[in-house]
C-alpha cells in the first residue's frame, strides 16, 4: 500500500497530443494522434511526461496533473488521460513506486499521486483546471506549482497566465518551470535548424502571446472561440460541478457565453491565502 505525504506542490504537465496506446508505449509516432505540424515532436511529449515524474519523485509532497481535454474528433480519449496511460505503460520510467494489489499484480486504478485533468482546451485552462483538480482531490490549494511544457512557452505560461492580471499565483517564486522544446525550431526559439515548415506555427505562437496580453483570462471572442473549436465532444467548461462546491472553494468566478467559467478580474485567489479546507 502506498502512503502519500500531505501534498502541497502541484506539478502540471501540459498535453500536446493524444497517445492512442500501442506496443511501443508511445515511442512510435504512429501510436499518436497529432496535428501535422507536430510531426517529429512526440519524443518531446514523452520527455515532458518523464520530466514531470522526475519532479514528483524528487518531492514527496508533490502531486502531478496530466492536463488536457479530448481535443480530437477521432477519439473521446483526452490528452491528460493518454499521458497518464503512457506513464503507467512505461512503469513511470522507474521514478515512482507502482501500486500493487494484495495479490502482487499491478493495480488498475490511477496512481495516488497522479491527477488526470480532462477539461482544459488551452494552456491557461491547463493551469486553472489543474489547480481546481488539486483542491478537489486534496481539500487544500497548493503552496507551490511546477509547470512542464515547451521552453518557448515559459513567458506565456508563467509570466502571463500565472501573473497578477490573470490566475495570479503569487509570488512568482512559488512557481517552477521545466521547459523542453521540440526539435527543429527556428533559431530565434532556441533551435538550430532552419525548420521552414515550423516558422508559420512559431509566428503564430508570437501572435497568441499578444492575444493573451490583451485578454489575460481568454474570455474574448478570439481565444474563447479557439477553445470552442477544440471541443468536438462538448466537454463541460465549468470549473465546478455545482454551486456548493464553488462556494466551498473560495474562488470567485463568472460565466462566459453561457458555456464557460472564468475567474473574476479582481476576485479572491485562495491559493494565495494559505491552506483552504474543502
Question: Could you say what each language-model-derived stretch is?
Answer:
Residues 189-260:
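C-terminal capping/extension of enzyme domains
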Residues 1-122, 233-278:
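N-terminal beta-strand-loop-alpha-helix module at the start
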Residues 113-138:
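Internal catalytic-core helix/loop-beta-alpha segment
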Residues 7, 11, 20, 163-178:
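Protein-protein interaction regions
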